[in-house]
Amino acid sequence: GVIQNGLYLGLIFLALTKIDSNVSVIIASILPLTVAFFSWVFFKSRLSLLGLSGLFVGLIGVLLIMIQRVEKEYEILGITLCIMGLLATTFSTLIITKININKNNILIVVGLQMLAGSLFLLPLSYFFEVWSISFNMTFLFTFLYIAAFPGIIGPVIWFYLQKEIGAVKYSSFHFLVPFFGIAISYFLLGETLTFSDMIGVIVIIIGLYLVNRDKKGF
């Protein structure tokens, strides 16, 4: 809870005040590679050439989609915060994979994780945040959406997949973040899809296929 909800999400939110969101997506997409590397360092886990190739192919697909969307200069502080957040979620992923969690208790674990993260952030927010909230429909919808999807549904799926398919194969699905981002932008915001976007999506799918064809896993 402290690592994932407190450090990772807290650092990413801070980073987004300093850098373009597209840059943060590119950095976050390195997660499968950092998980694979630290799994090898700490647990001597190995990924086959096929699986490793899939990770790099997926990352190339992400770059094809996102690099064209980086429009403004970025601050070194924002990059640093984003990398720290990446490392936090890397270690959180490895810890969850290795500890024994009963699948029937996942909701309880998610609740405790959110509680631990909120207790960690509460004193920090008291001293460093402005306690002023404008209660309106936009705030209410945003709050409920974040609580339901990133707060509850996402972590439940996160815990389940890590126990079922392993850390590296699970983290490889982070490559789909830019895909869903451009899909939502296209259908809801009317943004234009480029040829590079379509090629990037195809490359990401190939990368995911290669990773999940790897029988060794982690």
Predicted feature locations:
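Specific transmembrane alpha-helical segments of multi-pass solute transporters/efflux pumps
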Residues: 1-28, 64, 147-165
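Hydrophobic/small/kink-forming positions within alpha-helical transmembrane segments
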Residues: 2-6, 10, 32-37, 63, ...
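Transmembrane alpha-helical segments that form core, pore/gating elements
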Residues: 35-37, 41, 73-128, 143, ...
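Loop-to-transmembrane-helix transition segments
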Residues: 1-12, 77-85, 134-153, 174
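Hydrophobic transmembrane alpha-helices of multi-pass small-molecule transport proteins
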Residues: 30, 38, 47-67, 86, ...
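Hydrophobic/aromatic residues within transmembrane alpha-helices
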Residues: 15, 41-43, 47, 99, ...
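Membrane-interface helix-cap regions at the ends of transmembrane helices
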Residues: 10-11, 37, 59-73, 116-139, ...
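Cytoplasmic-side transmembrane-helix entry/capping segments in multi-pass membrane proteins
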Residues: 1-2, 47-58, 78-79, 104-113, ...
